[in-house]
Amino acid sequence: REIADIHLQACLDAGIKLTGTNAEVALGQWEYQCFGNGIKAADDLWVSRYLLYKIAEEFGVCVNIHPKPKTGDWNGSGMHCNFSNEEMRTNGTEELFSTMCEKLGEVHAEGIAAYGSDNDMRLTGLHETQSIDQFSYGVSDRGASIRIPVYTVEHNWNGYLEDRRPSANMDPYLV
């Protein structure tokens, strides 16, 4: 936790908008949420990773962003990406969100190809994932490729989508 707290402060000091940190399912697994728009979001993610590696060095530990750093019956490491546009946030409808999800399903294979190496080890259909070769979406469905948050539905379909397919080692410029 000390590393996570120091990392959070280092990112904030660097002008990177982190919106939270939390411990995850696997032992020693931590998550942080990075907020940004477009290319700035990708830039900030790379800098935040760099800061995390440097801080971990000072503690004599290593950071591992492999999608499944240890095989077994537990969750892997993903880089879930929330996204929205102005229409989704202010004039959304169930039809709009369904159409967007269907369009993402049409290019599922292309997305998977860009979402990080060894992602097949994580996207097995178990441990809050959809199988790498299948596409699905649903409200509050952590086992779907695309999760529609309850927040979005409760706010008259105004909100965002969460792409749960990218792995922790993904290149944010490709995603």
Label for each model-derived stretch:
Residues R1-V175:
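Glycine-rich, acidic/polar active-site loops that bind/position phosphate-bearing ligands
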